[in-house]
Amino acid sequence: MTNSLLNNGDMVQGVELPDADQQFWWDSLAPILSRMLQCSKYSVQSQANILSFFKDFIVPSYGPRPSIDGEFFWKSYVTYNHTPGQVSFNFHKNKCTVRLSNVPTAPLAGTASDPFNQKGVVQTIKHIQKALPGMDMTIFDYFSEAFLVADEDTVGLDARKPVPQYNQLVVASMLGYDFEPVPRVKVYFNPRWKALQMNIENHDLIWTAINNLGSPIKSYKRTLDLLQECGNPRQPGGWIFQPEFISFDMGENMSNTARLKLYGFTTKTCWSHIESIYTLDRRLDDAETQRGLAVLKRLWHLALSIPEDHDENQDLPPCPHLTAGVIYNYELRENSAKPEAKIYIPVRFYGSGDGKVIEGLVDFFKSEGWDELATSYQRDFVSVFSTPDGKMVGEHHDISFSYKNDHPYVTAYYRPELIRPMERHIV
């Protein structure tokens, strides 16, 4: 990361978008994204290309802007306060790349025409095809049909939801983006509405859809079999894996090479449980897994400011938020002998504030020999997420960890603070 930021005004200021909704999202998010790109040493041409793609293909997907009193048009718990997206820095070997994600929202979301906000993701992917005409649609089309509720089946389904907050808890779809050498899209599907409509368990629907995918899934069979085995505990009351949602990559010339990820969630926050998740309840005990586990444990304690003498079988102090807990995933790669585990450390729910999270990350970077990141991270965080008048416009939400080829991959996810709607609202 860099020592100082250039003036980003030329690329983001004075840009006029087609309507007030898109203008709001651009004015709120483009300055943050631009500062992140500069901070991460993207070339000027790359910055321009990414911001252009963001303006033309991502900004429209955010949908209607918040109301004049700040209420989001479509509320979802992709962040703790319904902000419909995140931005992130991915750190690996002292290098930094920029990514972002959001919940595509169609203008009719929440109406009888689109009660569960399912149409936004389909519309956005079709729009992105204009920029990436070689993007293979096979897997997207398959999972869309498997996981999205058909229009004729949505009638009366909302009345069957098990809890009042179900619309916010079930993020039916989300899109993630990285940008180099060309934009690549990651699609997330949570099929709980479809499972409710079919009267089956959500995880059973996910496994059935994956197993019925056919030839594209054959090269993942070893890892799939292992994960499905984890649906049964090794001992009474032990850890089991039941997928909550999935994601997969889309891009040009990726017909059968898209990574597939299966996500789980737990409200248990003791280290011993995290260890079970990372090792598939000790089904994985190879040397690389053990090395990764040791590095994860160090980051877990540093990011959450956990004392060294904390009981590994004791949960963290409880957080009252409805979605508090730990998300994790298993990445499947072709012909791999084992899945790659990723743990999302929930610093917003269980951490001690941005200052302590920064302190923990800096200590972790130092321990990995990432000296440049250790030196610049606090300064760059403030530079990216502060306005000229000193207001902070972002906070840490999660820190993810995975371990590949004997190296850690760490991603810091941030919730951007949007500009006050009343400052941009056009009546």
UniProtKB/Swiss-Prot annotation:
Positions contributing to substrate binding: R99, K186, Y188, R259, K261, Y263, Y344, Y409, Y413
Record's keyword terms, sorted: Transferase
Keyword Metal-binding: no
Pathway(s) annotated for this protein in UniProt: Secondary metabolite biosynthesis
Binding, L-tryptophan: Y77, V78
Entry EC number(s): 2.5.1.-
rRNA processing recorded as keyword: no
Molecular functions (GO terms): transferase activity, transferring alkyl or aryl (other than methyl) groups
GO BP, sorted A to Z: alkaloid metabolic process
Broad enzyme group: transferase
Function: Indole diterpene prenyltransferase; part of the gene cluster that mediates the biosynthesis of the indole diterpenes penitrems. The geranylgeranyl diphosphate (GGPP) synthase penG catalyzes the first step in penitrem biosynthesis via conversion of farnesyl pyrophosphate and isopentyl pyrophosphate into geranylgeranyl pyrophosphate (GGPP). Condensation of indole-3-glycerol phosphate with GGPP by the prenyl transferase penC then forms 3-geranylgeranylindole (3-GGI).
Recorded family membership: Belongs to the tryptophan dimethylallyltransferase family.
Name of the protein described by the UniProt record: Indole diterpene prenyltransferase penD
Originating species: Penicillium crustosum (Blue mold fungus)
